[in-house]
Amino acid sequence: MLILTRRIGETLMVGDEVTVTVLGVKGNQVRIGVNAPKDIAVHREEIYQRIQREKQNQEEQDN
């Protein structure tokens, strides 16, 4: 795992097309902005996990 330190307004690059910018810090919450091409899905981890479970459930029902 790469660990980086960024300040508000600073950005990091993921590959050539995805940027992650620190928008704000309030208490233990960090607001980030993600710019990515439309063909790259960006989700919070809990949403991604739910999508994966739903896909798995659908595949099981199809079999």
Swiss-Prot record:
Highest taxon in the source lineage: Bacteria
- Cell compartments where the protein resides: Cytoplasm
Q: Pfam families given for it?
A: CsrA
Report the principal subcellular site. Answer: cytoplasm
Q: Name one GO cellular component term.
A: cytosol
| UniProt keywords, alphabetically | Activator, Cytoplasm, Repressor, RNA-binding, Translation regulation
Instruction: Tell me yes or no: is Membrane among this UniProt entry's keywords.
Output: no
- Per its UniProt record, what InterPro entries does this chain match? CsrA, CsrA_sf
Q: What Gene Ontology molecular-function terms does this entry list?
A: mRNA 5'-UTR binding
Q: Which GO terms describe its biological process?
A: mRNA catabolic process; negative regulation of translational initiation; positive regulation of translational initiation; regulation of carbohydrate metabolic process
Q: Which HAMAP family match?
A: CsrA (MF_00167)
Q: NCBIfam families recorded for this chain?
A: csrA (TIGR00202), PRK01712.1 (NF002469)
Assembly description: Homodimer; the beta-strands of each monomer intercalate to form a hydrophobic core, while the alpha-helices form wings that extend away from the core.
Hey, which family's this protein in? Belongs to the CsrA/RsmA family.
Summarizing the function annotation, the protein's role is: A key translational regulator that binds mRNA to regulate translation initiation and/or mRNA stability. Mediates global changes in gene expression, shifting from rapid growth to stress survival by linking envelope stress, the stringent response and the catabolite repression systems. Usually binds in the 5'-UTR; binding at or near the Shine-Dalgarno sequence prevents ribosome-binding, repressing translation, binding elsewhere in the 5'-UTR can activate translation and/or stabilize the mRNA. Its function is antagonized by small RNA(s).
Stored PANTHER family: CARBON STORAGE REGULATOR
Its recorded name reads Translational regulator CsrA
Q: Which organism is it from?
A: Cellvibrio japonicus (strain Ueda107)
Supply the gene name: csrA
